[in-house]
């Protein structure tokens, strides 16, 4: 089944873009906002809404496959790709990715992805967000075109089997690392809480004491509030380079 068209639409992510460099330089909190001036290219504020691009692949029988291009919270920092703004990158998808996909048979996930991954713009690979979202859409398109689930396509093309048990998912608390940890415990999240440890004074402590205090609280909270002893999640905390 051939790909008839590729359409893009701007959208919002579930989280935010934060200027990590500005935070390292002392940008403070005021509720959900960060106070201070951004320093990383492309940022209009230290915290901005996360932007996404939905990529829709339209098959010749009218089915529509979807993929969402989205970038990480700390875009533009630590060697990451630049801030992902829909207005800047929809034209890239339309100019470089869409022509590659038009008229192609939607029957080879890995092959189509390899060709998409090989595209370069001004000597550089496509933004990671584009590769992330377009590969999703290609996977969905191949699944719909061949009457399979996306997990079945992956299993078939990589020579593996579909898991019979749920795959553990890593959940992220954001700044509200206490109340949101409670929500994770109630819902039996398998890996938690990330916790966004991005400030020495308020979250880490000069000698790590605040982080240690939080880890002890989290351990005790799980042991005290879990529904039963079978719930033993993996603890994973993320510290930015502070």
Task: Describe every region a protein language model picked out.
Residues 58, 64-148:
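Metal- or metallocofactor-binding catalytic centers and their adjacent structured scaffolds
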Residues 82-96, 205-221:
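Well-ordered, non-membrane alpha-helical segments in soluble/globular domains
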Residues 140-144, 148-214:
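Glycine-rich, mobile lid/loop segments that gate access to catalytic sites or pores
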Residues 107-112, 150-153, 223-237:
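Flexible, glycine/charged-enriched surface loops at secondary-structure junctions
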Residues 1-54:
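Short, Gly/Pro- and small/polar-rich lid/capping loops
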Residues 179-186, 216-230:
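Acidic (Asp/Glu)-rich catalytic clusters
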Residues 53-61, 65-71, 180-193:
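Short beta-strand elements
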Residues 240-242:
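Conserved small/polar residues in nucleotide/adenosyl-binding loops
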């Amino acid at each position: 089944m051939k790909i008839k068209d590729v359409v893009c639409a701007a959208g919002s992510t579930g989280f935010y873009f934060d200027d990590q460099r500005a935070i390292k330089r002392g940008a403070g909190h005021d509720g959900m906002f960060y106070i201070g001036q951004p320093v990383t290219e492309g940022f209009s504020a230290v915290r901005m809404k996360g932007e996404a691009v939905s990529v829709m692949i339209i098959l010749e029988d009218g089915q529509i496959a979807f993929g969402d291009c989205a970038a990480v919270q700390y875009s533009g920092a630590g060697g990451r790709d630049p801030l992902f703004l829909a207005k800047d990158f929809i034209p890239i998808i339309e100019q470089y990715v869409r022509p590659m996909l038009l008229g192609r048979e939607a029957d080879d996930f890995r092959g189509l992805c390899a060709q998409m991954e090989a595209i370069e713009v001004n000597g550089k690979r496509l933004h990671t967000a584009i590769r992330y979202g377009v590969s999703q859409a290609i996977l969905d398109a191949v699944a719909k075109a061949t009457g399979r689930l996306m997990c079945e396509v992956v299993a078939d093309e990589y020579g593996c089997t579909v898991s019979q048990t749920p795959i553990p998912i890593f959940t992220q608390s954001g700044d509200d690392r206490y109340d949101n940890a409670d929500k994770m415990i109630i819902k039996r999240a398998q890996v938690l809480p990330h916790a966004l440890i991005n400030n020495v004074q308020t979250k880490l402590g000069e000698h790590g004491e605040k982080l240690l205090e939080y880890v002890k609280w989290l351990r005790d909270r799980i042991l005290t509030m879990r529904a039963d002893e079978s719930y033993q999640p993996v603890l994973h905390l993320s510290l930015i380079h502070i």
